Amino acid sequence: MNANGEANGGVDSAALDELIPQIFDQMRTNQLDGSGAAAWGTAAVSTATLLKEMEQLDQIIPVLQQLNESLRRSTGENLSRIRRTCEAVNRVLDTWIKIQSQAGYVGELMDDSEYLSYMEKTRGDEGQQQAYMESLRKQVEELRRKVDERRAVEAAAAAPRAPERTRGASGIPRGGSRITKRGGTTVRGRRMFR
């Protein structure tokens, strides 16, 4: 510590406690004399009042620090609690969506006349269910066979016919395949060579 009360570049708190009253006394005398560069008005500031305010601020600062720390701790806890709550809500919503999906599926089945007739005919009997499904398979196979036959008939009717022979047995074009006009031009407007 040096002569000015500075320890390692800082001001000691005891020295500061001595300097503050001296500074305020100097400020008060400058204010009363009017010789100071800054005139503070007519209100006198007492050192005791300022020291009392400083003590109150010193009491408030630890409270604010504790509040800040508790907010920092609780923020992490609250965020994890919020995350857990959101995950639980998502699980509940997923379950609800599955329930709604199943309810929709059951509703569609109850509106389906084929399903209702299946349920009436089988009444939960495994043998009857097998027989009913086999009869439906036979119906489907019969319908597929009929569709295939009809497609074959339509395909045969729509198939292009083989073109008539335009060449003779020797491969020479037949003479009647072009019609010529007088003057040696064909119907299409081309001249024939003679």
From Swiss-Prot:
Record bears the keyword Nucleus: yes
Keywords carried by this UniProt record: Cell cycle, Cell division, Centromere, Chromosome, Chromosome partition, Coiled coil, Cytoplasm, Cytoskeleton, Kinetochore, Microtubule, Mitosis, Nucleus
A Pfam family matched in the record: DASH_Duo1
Localisation per UniProt entry: Nucleus; Cytoplasm, Cytoskeleton, Spindle pole; Chromosome, Centromere, Kinetochore
Domain of life: Eukaryota
Biological process according to GO: attachment of spindle microtubules to kinetochore; cell division; mitotic sister chromatid biorientation; protein transport along microtubule to mitotic spindle pole body
Span list, region Disordered: 151-194
GO CC list: cytoplasm; DASH complex; microtubule; mitotic spindle; spindle pole
Coiled coil: 127-156
InterPro entries: DASH_Duo1
Key word DNA damage present: no
Assembly notes: Component of the DASH complex consisting of ASK1, DAD1, DAD2, DAD3, DAD4, DAM1, DUO1, HSK3, SPC19 and SPC34, with a stoichiometry of one copy of each subunit per complex. Multiple DASH complexes oligomerize to form a ring that encircles spindle microtubules and organizes the rod-like NDC80 complexes of the outer kinetochore. DASH complex oligomerization strengthens microtubule attachments. On cytoplasmic microtubules, DASH complexes appear to form patches instead of rings. Within the complex, DAM1 and DUO1 may form the microtubule connections.
Protein family (similarity comment): Belongs to the DASH complex DUO1 family.
PANTHER family: DASH COMPLEX SUBUNIT DUO1
Free-text function comment from the UniProt entry: Component of the DASH complex that connects microtubules with kinetochores and couples microtubule depolymerisation to chromosome movement; it is involved in retrieving kinetochores to the spindle poles before their re-orientation on the spindle in early mitosis and allows microtubule depolymerization to pull chromosomes apart and resist detachment during anaphase.
Descriptive protein name: DASH complex subunit DUO1
Organism: Eremothecium gossypii (strain ATCC 10895 / CBS 109.51 / FGSC 9923 / NRRL Y-1056)
Gene encoding the protein: DUO1
